[in-house]
Amino acid sequence: MEGDTRRMWTQSESESIRSSKVRPLPLRKVTLYLTFVLIGVADTTYLDHAGTTLYAKSLIESFSRELTSNLFGNPHSLSASSQLSTRRVDDVRLRALRFFKADPDEFDLVFVANATAAIKLVADGMRDSTRQGFWYGYHVDAHTSLVGVRELAEKGGRCFTSDDEVEDWISKLCDVRSESLKLFAYPAQSNMNGRRLPLSWCKKIRNQGETAGGNVYTLLDAASLVSTSTLDLSDAAAAPDFTVLSFYKIFGFPDLGALIVRKSAGQIFEHRRYFGGGTVDMVLTRGLQWHAKKQSSIHDRLEDGTLPFHDIIALDSAFATHERLFGSMQNISSHTRFLAKRLYDRLNALRHFNGQRVCELYKSPRSDYNQPSTQGPIIAFNLRNSQGSWIGKSEVERLAAMRNIQIRSGSLCNPGGTSGSLGWTGADLLQQFSAGLRCGDDHDVMDGRPTGVLRLSLGAMTNLEDINTFVEFVEEFYVEKVATMDSLVTPVHSVPLQQPRFYIESLSLYPIKSCGPFRVPDGRRWEVRREGLAWDREWCLIHQGTGAALNQKKYPRMALIRPSIDLDRNVLRVTCEEPGSTNQKLLEVSLLREDTELATTSLCQRTSKASTVCGDQVTVQAYTSPSVAQFFSDFLGVPCTLARFGPHSSTRYASPRKAPGAWKQYLRKFVMPGSFPQEPSPPPAEKNPILLSNESPILLISRSSVNHLNENIKANQKRNRTGTSKAVAADVFRANIVVAESLADSPKVEQPYIEDQWEALKIGPGELQFDVLGSCQRCSMVCIDQFTGVRRDEPFSTLAKTRKINNKIVFGRHCSLSASEVTKEQHDNAERWTLMVGDIVTPSYAHDYDL
């Protein structure tokens, strides 16, 4: 047994296993369920084994014993420690070949960083082997790293869009005899949907290619396949010329890859131009420029520089641990096949109340989860609501993460597979690229189609509990069980005849983006600018290495950084304090823009996937003082410094939020046709400048809505018996304005979400006018407690069930100073452009609710 946190099959699971034709791992092996190094992983449902599988605690312990019991030197030396490393590397190389049943007389194995590095090694060898260049063909299901080889193929190439095209090309290879060098590459298993391609192509191509001149080589990407299946290279005549893979996909650790070369194809590397340390017998640098490459083996010529010998020695421990835990790859293959079939069937069976499918599954018609030769344990899919609309992949992944479920979403580095499954043409994607679509962004649905997929991939340590957890997650959040009009907004008929009085309960600004709030003191009027409240999100913290703006989603401790504005002393005061601690750190910087500690730098937020402003590139002024950088770096544990983006340098604008008819479009699902007239074309949108806020100058929420949300949270937790409920504070929504109702007047009952009906606002004695731009789309950052920096499940989980429209989770309203206000002659009156706690808020109600 390995540790005390092992997981056992339940009685129901065992009965299900016995009745199935496909067998998972034997029970004696399953009881060796791994304990892992990372704290808390026992509570995690990990379904991203195609990215990397999980490593066993005993693997790390075994490797640690190796390091503490032996002295390993650089293999390029002749010392005893170096020779020990050399012997161990040779032994592991042989063990790796035998793991894939590859005869060392027929094959050589080259250690590389990963499968991509192995692909590039082959591509460079092909390019250097002849001055005429080479022709390159690849299957449409290829990983991006295989696709990239085409840029080195001077003889051109071809993307084969189907298996039939490949078969047709193979059959015609012998028709034309050619001396031109050719390389055909394909994946043994699609990393997108797990479809397995014919391994027989390599032998067919070799047989046909020999008739055509013998210059056709094959490259097999086995990285996805070998994580859960045997790769059998025992028949050298049928094996690929080059096979690439990554060991971390099999064992989780070490981070190492391999290129397995048929020795008969090794001549491809004879003209490789680059040489590194350890690959040559002699090098002349004075006078004659000459070198002699090593000829003893293929790996001696290709492994440039010092090998990662510690990682290779760790691989020996990985082989031993893997065999002890699972016995064989065949056991893992049977185990994952059983679970994948179960998961696929359950997802495929999910239906909404009206019979509509919940999951759109992207499985090849050629594949079958019961047939290991055609399908691996990967499932690619998207979700739809009951009306057939797509649910954004990013929302699903974020909500899953809140439930400790780890999955993958996006195009998965498989451009051909995803575009084909989703129906995108090359012209379509070019158009969407021009519209802003980028790899890793949050553009989930464009032109009515998803831009990526969700992926579940299973591994040796996956069990039925993991399958049940994910399916139950989908059922809880995405299966609509009854036809209801969600109580997202107050219904049309409930707009009160006698409107309630609203007032500003609190005013907050966030001087440093993603850090704590500064609450405007009661009785003090605060300036409002076109960009929002004065000093709001004028600063940010940037990573000193990448220049990316930091945010709470990645660094929750930013909530404990509390800035305040001292107008009397003209300083930004920042404190950092651990919850319950009296040890407070203090920093003050000048509010004056002429601060000599500022230096202009470029901030490219594109590098920050989690930020909603990541499409913008802005220029900020970074503080050069080492003490400023140390203040924030020490507290967050990340190298960062403070930077400023002032109102006079703003080149950012609020996102156009209003979508006339959005609420009507939602209502049309439930009412007879013709109930709503056709909307006129909207007028051109005004541009509202913003600083470093995500989407708009001002964010407003309602106290009544927060109270109602907390009632829903309490009810959900009582219904699910999840323990004592804990209300969320309004602070988690990071609003600038919290509006409350004056219940002393009629009606005396709070009206949650009535702000969804607001079109404009007049605030204060001067009736300062604001436009309501639309609703605020929420992400998992609302789950970070702003007083402790601790991440929770709520309120995002409840919002996902109660505040979703057009497949977006919304709470709060985006606002901006009215354009008419800006153009008034008296706008220079500073007293007019101010707000204060207690100011009366008078809303204008829209006839159409623009969510």
UniProtKB/Swiss-Prot annotation:
Its cofactor is pyridoxal 5'-phosphate. Keywords: Molybdenum cofactor biosynthesis, Pyridoxal phosphate, Transferase. GO terms for molecular function: lyase activity; molybdenum cofactor sulfurtransferase activity; molybdenum ion binding; pyridoxal phosphate binding. Its EC number is 2.8.1.9. The modification N6-(pyridoxal phosphate)lysine is found at K249. One of its GO terms (biological process) is Mo-molybdopterin cofactor biosynthetic process. The active site is at C413. Belongs to the class-V pyridoxal-phosphate-dependent aminotransferase family. MOCOS subfamily. Gene3D superfamilies: Aspartate Aminotransferase, domain 1 (3.90.1150.10), Type I PLP-dependent aspartate aminotransferase-like (Major domain) (3.40.640.10). This is Molybdenum cofactor sulfurase. Pfam families: Aminotran_5, MOSC, MOSC_N. The keyword Transferase applies. It is an enzyme of class 2 (transferase). InterPro entries: Aminotrans_V_dom, MoCF_Sase_C, MoCo_sulfurase, MOCOS_middle, PyrdxlP-dep_Trfase, PyrdxlP-dep_Trfase_major, PyrdxlP-dep_Trfase_small. PROSITE patterns: MOSC (PS51340). Sulfurates the molybdenum cofactor. Sulfation of molybdenum is essential for xanthine dehydrogenase (XDH) and aldehyde oxidase (ADO) enzymes in which molybdenum cofactor is liganded by 1 oxygen and 1 sulfur atom in active form. Residues 665-844 form the MOSC domain. Pathway: Cofactor biosynthesis; molybdopterin biosynthesis. It catalyses: Mo-molybdopterin + L-cysteine + AH2 = thio-Mo-molybdopterin + L-alanine + A + H2O.
